[in-house]
Amino acid sequence: MSSVYDWFQERLEIQAIADDITSKYVPPHVNIFYCLGGITLTCFIVQVATGFAMTFYYRPTVTEAFASVEYLMTEVNFGWLIRSVHRWSASMMVLNMILHVCRVYLTGGFKKPRELTWVTGVLLASVTVSFGVTGYSLPWDQVGYWACKIVTGVPDAVPIVGGLIVQVLRGGVSVGQSTLTRFYSAHTFVLPVVAAVLMLTHFVMIRKQGISGPL
């Protein structure tokens, strides 16, 4: 085992990396509320894992979406559990994100020199809301359909470009197959990639600047 370790150590200097990770100073004022960001990340990882599992059975078409979800819930082994965990972790992710934002705001974690960390956090909050909006409509039941119709219709109130935004979101004038395809692509590919990039940036800045001081 030591020879394997030495082989990697010689090429990657893994001991220096391990020392840097484990020797980071943690201020004495840090308490359990400073873990809310990490809990949100954990919920996101659970979302990715369970969401990936569901893609094997979900069919993003207006004629088969609901039936595929029903099949997952009733016929697939532990399918009901996978979807339930996905839904529960989504709710927990939103709740912990809100609490995390409140903690950062109340402790002044957004102040200089951590303004950019705050900006990436706000962008992550927007992405999280977008996850909820796009995922809610994927079963394509009555609730999902009308939620999709209402949400995509909101930009219509924007002067001049409102109608164009609505058509881009829906893939046409009305809600249909193109809308579901857009929501599915955004929920399973675009948003996860954007979230991962923002999270990496967020964590790198936290690692560089450290945790903010007490009030």
Swiss-Prot record:
Domain of life (superkingdom): Eukaryota
Organism of provenance: Emiliania huxleyi (Coccolithophore)
Binding site for heme c: C35
Miscellaneous comment in the UniProt entry for this protein: Heme 1 (or BH or b566) is high-potential and absorbs at about 566 nm, and heme 2 (or BL or b562) is low-potential and absorbs at about 562 nm.
Function of the molecule: Component of the cytochrome b6-f complex, which mediates electron transfer between photosystem II (PSII) and photosystem I (PSI), cyclic electron flow around PSI, and state transitions.
Keyword Cytoplasm: no
Protein name stated in the entry: Cytochrome b6
A single Gene Ontology CC term: chloroplast thylakoid membrane
Listed cofactors: heme b; heme c
